[in-house]
Curated annotation (Swiss-Prot):
Residues 95-119 are annotated as: Disordered. Residues 6-36 form a coiled coil. The lineage of its organism: Viruses, Varidnaviria, Bamfordvirae, Nucleocytoviricota, Megaviricetes. This is Uncharacterized protein 014R. It comes from Frog virus 3 (isolate Goorha) (FV-3). Keywords: Coiled coil. The keyword Coiled coil applies. The keyword Coiled coil applies. It comes from the Viruses.
Length: 119
């Protein structure tokens, strides 16, 4: 069992390392894409063929607000505060109806009563 735990931890470490690498690459990709779209705009080019059936197309997309922000804005118009919205949203959350088995990583051991939640 110890060997399996160590193998699991090794794999999780590798996955975390790849995720950090991917995150850094996405930041770099975003900067390159922004520069590319700026250059496309200056050159008057609307699209660039990047493979046989794929194109990079420069188009403006409207910036969307998240739904919670929309609730806050609408509630402020009705005279409510953000705290009122948070309170109402917490009341509207559903009840726990069951559970599923998953492996979870925690930073500390579970409390004794948390292990025996069923009874």
């Amino acid at each position: 069992m110890e060997t399996l735990v160590q193998a699991y931890l090794d794999i999780q470490g590798k996955i975390a390392e790849f995720r950090r690498e991917i995150k850094a690459l996405r930041v770099e990709e975003k900067a390159i894409t922004a520069n590319l779209f700026e250059a496309m705009g200056e050159a008057g080019v609307e699209s660039i063929r990047i493979s046989e059936d794929r194109y990079l197309v420069a188009e403006e997309k409207p910036k969307r607000t998240r739904s919670k922000q929309q609730f806050y804005q609408a509630a402020e118009g009705e005279g409510f505060t953000q705290e009122d919205v948070d309170r109402l949203m917490s009341l509207s959350r559903g009840a726990v109806t069951g559970s599923s088995s998953n492996v979870k990583i925690r930073k500390s051991a579970p409390a004794r009563n948390e292990e025996d939640d069923d009874g």
